[in-house]
């Protein structure tokens, strides 16, 4: 089975892919926010193209574990994605995923300017890998 990780940023949605064989998430692409309908259609196309069985949406909890506006948005988006596609959608705590993604990319030698186009997909990979690790622990 394949899995798609999603990092819902303010301007972009990062996507990452993994499967049961390798159990290693890798950055896939970035979707620039347009409208909710266009975003859902783009993600639905990716789910079909890669024959994804489960999507994992990052849940941006506050550091104390409480939910704010961003977490409520992620929950609503996940529910809408599941309804629109019929693909099961799970939520996963994404605290510090962007920080970890930026650190990984800097270690690989990317400049601050180059991070902008890559960090969302890398953060989606961090989220998906965390979910996979927890699932297979």
Curated annotation (Swiss-Prot):
Swiss-Prot/TrEMBL GO biological process terms: rRNA 5'-end processing
InterPro entries linked: RNaseH-like_sf, YqgF, YqgF/RNaseH-like_dom, YqgF/RNaseH-like_dom_sf
CDD domains the record matches: YqgF
Pfam families attached to this UniProt entry: RuvX (PF03652)
GO CC terms of this entry: cytosol
Keyword tRNA processing annotated: no
Alphabetical UniProt keywords: Cytoplasm, Hydrolase, Nuclease, Ribosome biogenesis
Enzymatic class: hydrolase
EC code(s) of this entry: 3.1.-.-
One MF annotation (Gene Ontology) recorded for this entry: nuclease activity
Subcellular location as annotated: Cytoplasm
HAMAP family: Nuclease_YqgF
Family of this protein: Belongs to the YqgF nuclease family.
Xref: NCBIfam families: RNAse_H_YqgF
Entry function: Could be a nuclease involved in processing of the 5'-end of pre-16S rRNA.
Protein name: Putative pre-16S rRNA nuclease
Organism of provenance: Anaeromyxobacter sp. (strain Fw109-5)
């Amino acid at each position: 089975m394949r899995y798609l990780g999603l990092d819902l940023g303010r301007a972009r949605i990062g996507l990452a892919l993994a499967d049961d064989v390798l159990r290693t998430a890798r950055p896939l692409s970035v979707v620039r926010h347009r409208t909710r309908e266009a975003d859902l259609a783009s993600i639905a196309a990716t789910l079909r193209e890669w024959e994804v069985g489960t999507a994992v949406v990052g849940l941006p909890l506050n550091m104390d574990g409480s939910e704010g506006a961003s977490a409520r948005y992620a929950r609503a988006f996940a529910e809408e994605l599941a309804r629109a596609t019929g693909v099961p959608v799970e939520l996963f705590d994404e605290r510090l995923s962007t920080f970890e993604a930026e650190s990984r990319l800097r270690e690989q030698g990317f400049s601050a300017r180059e991070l902008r186009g890559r960090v969302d997909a890398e953060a989606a990979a961090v989220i998906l890998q965390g979910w996979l690790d927890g699932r297979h622990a």
